Amino acid sequence: MTKVLVYLPMLPPAERGRCCAFLSEHFPSVSIARADKLAELDPHIATAEILVTFGAHLGLDADSILGRGKSLKWVMALGTGVDHITDVPALRSQALVTNMHGMHGVPMTEAAILSMLALAREMPRMLRNQDRHHWERYGARLIAGKTVGIFGIGAIAEVLGPACQALGMKVLGISSSARQPPGFDRIVHRDRLAEVIGELDHFVILTPLTDATRNIVDAAVLARMKPTAFLINLARGGIVDEPALIAALKERKIAGAAIDVFVQEPLPADHPFWSMENVILSPHIGAFNADYMSQVVPLVKENMTRYLAGDIDKMINVVRKAQP
């Protein structure tokens, strides 16, 4: 019997149960095991054929967890980013990896627009004033008429670009591909990032973390940004040089940042980001929402059906194929 191990420790308990119940109902021929904590993996990880998880949920324990998966044939990532999985040398070569590419356009677009509006209208300042019962009126900035740079032109950007245009923004795409989707006034190659960064009022990072993008937003790039510009990172923490960003924010070389992803997650309690007045933090929930499981269910069902039927070559969103 095929054994499926569900490891989703960062999801609310109800969502974990919902995932297991769905798999049990639609695939009664498989054995479902659930682990909510690292210690609960031990009875199951060595014999599991399928691991259902988020890459970020593995975190710093990814090497240890995947290294014990001696029977793994498929890691089903319920998110888009898989660097926490595919970059782990301990993952057996016979295991294929899939993700949920294409499922996050709407929630990530909403997160990006919320971030831009909250930064432009100084929402942290409003909340601090509310907490102090302090009445202070000030002029907020508009995002209409401003230029947004979207770094990474994938499925999310295809939704975000037109949405920004609808709000009256000028949209500049930055990408390593030659794709020209609608919703962009202009698209330039990633090699020109430092050249165009000074044009931007809002810089939204959506690109995957790879060897080519690791720390690509460094001190030199940040120094070219407008002092009135905002940085929004919804992709991966490793894309931005965090010490350089901290320095730029402290010295007000940029106006502020909204950060959903970090080099170390969970973010340590003593990290400088927590106490910075020009920073908005969220705990890697840009794509996650109350209806998330409902959104990914069709793809989970389709891929499980194909896998169990032996139609591996027909599976969707395979980001790493199994090796013989």
Where do the language-model regions lie?
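Short, conserved loop/helix-junction motifs that constitute active-site signature segments
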Residues: 63-71, 88-92, 222-227, 248-252, ...
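C-terminal helix-to-coil terminal segments
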Residues: 98-111, 125, 263-324
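Glycine-rich NAD(P)-binding loop of Rossmann-like domains
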Residues: 125-159, 186-187
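N-terminal glycine-/charge-rich "phosphate-binding" loop or analogous flexible N-terminal tail
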Residues: 1-50, 55-57
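Rossmann-like adenosine-cofactor binding region
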Residues: 178-272
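A short, aliphatic-rich alpha-helical micro-motif
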Residues: 41-46, 66-69, 143, 195-200, ...
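Phosphate/diphosphate ligand-binding glycine-rich loop within oxidoreductases
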Residues: 47-127
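NAD(P)-binding Rossmann-fold cofactor-contacting core
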Residues: 166-183
